[in-house]
Amino acid sequence: MKRQVLTQQQYKRANRVMFFILTICYLFFVGIEISNVVKHGQSTMAYVRCGLYVAAILLTGVIVKLLAEKKAGTIAMAVLYIVVYAVLVFGNGAGTLVMAFPAIIGFMIFLNEPLIVIGSVISFLISIVKCILLNRAGDSLSLGFASVVILGSFVTIWCSRMAVRLLIDFSQENQAEIQKAAE
């Protein structure tokens, strides 16, 4: 698997952009919970999950502040997102499965194929577990939607790997051209 080695400055910029992307996702999670409370009535667990999403924003901010120039910051944000994403998915309907895609696309800025593949596979597994739970509950409409998301996850894994590989190749070609011009 391919990965591009980023400089500290590149990690700093990429981690800051990823913080912005994840903050938007977490705020969207809060919106999902609030709309469910409005639609279905008060739910203590919805408020607990909203608290978790706000805590995730704050924790992601701390991660970026402390580890902005390091790969560890990227990994910490990715792990946190997967955990919070799982809480969202298992606490809500099948439609929330699509929230894996903005993060997967965002994490492509790190040009790290293993990061993308691992994140995609974990979201794929979360989708499968959600489908199993929907099937047991007899929710065929949501099960059908979740099945489409699973297929979309598979396509995302494949396509994002291809895109990251090509972007790394482009980067290496550009570096070779710059080095050749410098000589």
Model-derived segments and spans:
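Short, Lys/Arg-rich, polar N-terminal cytosolic tail immediately upstream
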Residues: M1-Y11
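Hydrophobic transmembrane alpha-helices and their membrane-interface boundaries in multi-pass
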Residues: R16-N92, M99-I105, S123-L125
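Alpha-helical transmembrane segments and their interfaces in multipass membrane proteins
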Residues: V30-V54, I109, E113-Q172
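Short, charged/polar micro-motifs that form catalytic or ligand-binding hotspots
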Residues: N92-G93, L115
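Residue-level hotspots within the lipid-embedded alpha helices of multi-pass solute transporters
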Residues: G93-A94, S153
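Alpha-helix N-cap/helix-start motif
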Residues: G95-L97, I118
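Long, heptad-repeat coiled-coil alpha-helices that serve as cytosolic signaling/dimerization stalks
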Residues: E177-E183
